[in-house]
């Protein structure tokens, strides 16, 4: 009790408020009607878990590639447009995944602009004349969600690269080792894993995208069992499986950053120096950064802007202004509240 003080009271209240909904769900899952457990295990639950794992693996892998590669290129190399791309790469995080799912489906489906253009160019008359991947599929969901979630990994990995002491990079150069593989990645592991944990938690909690793409995941299963079978206990039981996933992710993130400490004892330059590359190298760096930006922001926003222009005459501007101000007020209020609570908890913890 030596660490107990007056600030511990509000922290305890906040913790109780946060944990109460979780306890309510666990109570409903294990102390409510448990007769549905055997039915769930023998029918839908294995499929929900498998699809969730596939989605997590796909989104996590692609987000890692996009996030880490862009973070390294932006931090390490000097090329045209770097200062703009450094912040532009965060823009996809502002677009909800389900909105991009709607936009991509309208653009790439059989009746959409892209396939229509291909049929006009090559003279194809029906879907039997050619093959085109179905955007409303597991692969499509992985692409859509990765294109908006990679900024979590990009932001945290770039912060790790920037805060790694320059002496570590210099040492790798002296011994002729690959700086990226042997220094940057191992030392950025806590940041990478923290970003990956956020990406995966966003993935398993997503409802809009998986519902629109008709993917049977645990999150969609919660709503199907709750509303379709009118079983709150069954929905709570599926939610408890989601809790297991979240706890595993938090544990992995903790293990990744445990004992990861280093200190720069020398004075002088403490951050990585930008490296000049050839013209071809600059082009490659530019393409690496443009690909996720195009996939996650430029293409979907262009499609949405086209919708706006085509339906400009029927737009209800009063409704848009009202909902815009409501969204801004809600986001500012929530972010301010979360920031204050987080600062309070950090101060008390330290």
Identify the residue ranges that each predicted region occupies.
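Solenoid-repeat scaffolds in large eukaryotic assemblies
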Residues: 172, 234-235
């Amino acid at each position: 009790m030596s660490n107990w003080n007056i600030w511990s009271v509000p922290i305890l209240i906040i913790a109780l408020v946060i944990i109460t909904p979780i306890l309510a769900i666990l109570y409903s899952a294990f102390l409510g009607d448990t007769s549905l457990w055997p039915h769930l295990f023998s029918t839908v639950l294995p499929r929900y878990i498998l699809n969730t794992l596939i989605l997590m693996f796909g989104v996590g892998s692609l987000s890692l590639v996009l996030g880490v590669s862009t973070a390294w290129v932006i931090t390490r190399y000097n090329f045209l447009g770097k200062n703009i791309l450094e912040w532009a790469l965060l823009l996809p995080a502002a677009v909800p995944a389900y909105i991009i799912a709607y936009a991509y489906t309208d653009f790439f489906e059989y009746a959409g602009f892209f396939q229509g253009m291909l049929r006009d160019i090559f003279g194809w008359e029906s879907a039997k004349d050619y093959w085109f991947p179905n955007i409303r599929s597991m692969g499509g969901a992985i692409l859509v969600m990765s294109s908006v979630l990679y900024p979590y990994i990009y932001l945290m990995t770039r912060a790790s690269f920037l805060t790694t002491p320059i002496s570590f990079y210099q040492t790798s150069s002296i011994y002729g080792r690959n700086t990226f593989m042997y220094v940057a990645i191992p030392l950025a592991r806590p940041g990478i894993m923290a970003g990956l944990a956020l990406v995966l938690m966003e993935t398993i909690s997503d409802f809009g995208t998986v519902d629109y793409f008709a993917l049977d995941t645990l999150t969609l299963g919660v709503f199907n069992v709750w509303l379709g079978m009118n079983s709150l206990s069954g929905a709570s039981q599926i939610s408890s499986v989601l809790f297991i996933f979240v706890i595993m992710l938090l544990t992995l993130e903790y293990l990744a950053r445990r004992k990861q400490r280093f200190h720069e004892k020398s004075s002088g330059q403490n951050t990585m120096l930008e490296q000049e590359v050839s013209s071809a190298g600059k082009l490659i760096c530019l393409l690496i950064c443009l690909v996720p930006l195009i996939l996650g922001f430029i293409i979907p926003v262009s499609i949405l802007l086209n919708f706006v222009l085509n339906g400009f005459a029927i737009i209800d501007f009063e409704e848009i202004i009202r909902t815009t101000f409501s969204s801004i007020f809600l986001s500012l209020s929530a972010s301010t509240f979360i920031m204050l609570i987080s600062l309070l908890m950090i101060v008390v913890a330290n």
